């Protein structure tokens, strides 16, 4: 590796020749040789310190491409119980999000209909169940509306949305109910 070095006499000559540039310092363009520093190499045969996951491949699974459709957030989990749904809604309320219910009669899974661009927004439009629950402060109110929506549309997919009314965006959505046989 080549290194450019400037002697102090050269820097002094440059500074005398151009008084406007007297504060300039020569650039540092190389590193010192590594042979000047003592090096201790430690051999590490521990598999957990290796960057790859080669030792853990047997326990990793991916989403099976056949037979299972991907739904919204948390779709990899088994259906949530009422208590688990209440905890999710409590989380939305703690984050000052407005809960809202939406339902879809035909396609609750991810597909492309109105938009061909990749990404989360795939062109699906769900129907809103009533209005967003702006005054809601308890998860039992949301679960009550969920039960009403189930009775009105037993074959529909129903999702709960957390809406941020300050930023005017949907923050979270997840499937709260899948029709029987799906």
Swiss-Prot record:
UniProt-listed GO biological process terms: photorespiration; reductive pentose-phosphate cycle
Transit peptide: first to last position: 1-58
Keywords: Calvin cycle, Carbon dioxide fixation, Chloroplast, Photorespiration, Photosynthesis, Plastid, Transit peptide
SUPFAM superfamilies in the record: RuBisCO, small subunit
Compartment(s): Plastid, Chloroplast
One GO MF term: ribulose-bisphosphate carboxylase activity
InterPro entries: RuBisCO_ssu, RuBisCO_ssu_dom, RuBisCO_ssu_N, RuBisCO_ssu_sf
CDD domains per record: RuBisCO_small
GO CC annotation: chloroplast
HAMAP family in alphabetical order: RuBisCO_S_bact
Miscellaneous note of the record: The basic functional RuBisCO is composed of a large chain homodimer in a 'head-to-tail' conformation. In form I RuBisCO this homodimer is arranged in a barrel-like tetramer with the small subunits forming a tetrameric 'cap' on each end of the 'barrel'.
Quaternary assembly: Heterohexadecamer of 8 large and 8 small subunits.
Family: Belongs to the RuBisCO small chain family.
Listed PANTHER family: RIBULOSE BISPHOSPHATE CARBOXYLASE SMALL CHAIN 1, CHLOROPLASTIC, RIBULOSE BISPHOSPHATE CARBOXYLASE SMALL SUBUNIT 1A, CHLOROPLASTIC-RELATED
Function summary: RuBisCO catalyzes two reactions: the carboxylation of D-ribulose 1,5-bisphosphate, the primary event in carbon dioxide fixation, as well as the oxidative fragmentation of the pentose substrate. Both reactions occur simultaneously and in competition at the same active site. Although the small subunit is not catalytic it is essential for maximal activity.
Protein name: Ribulose bisphosphate carboxylase small subunit, chloroplastic
UniProt gene name: RBCS
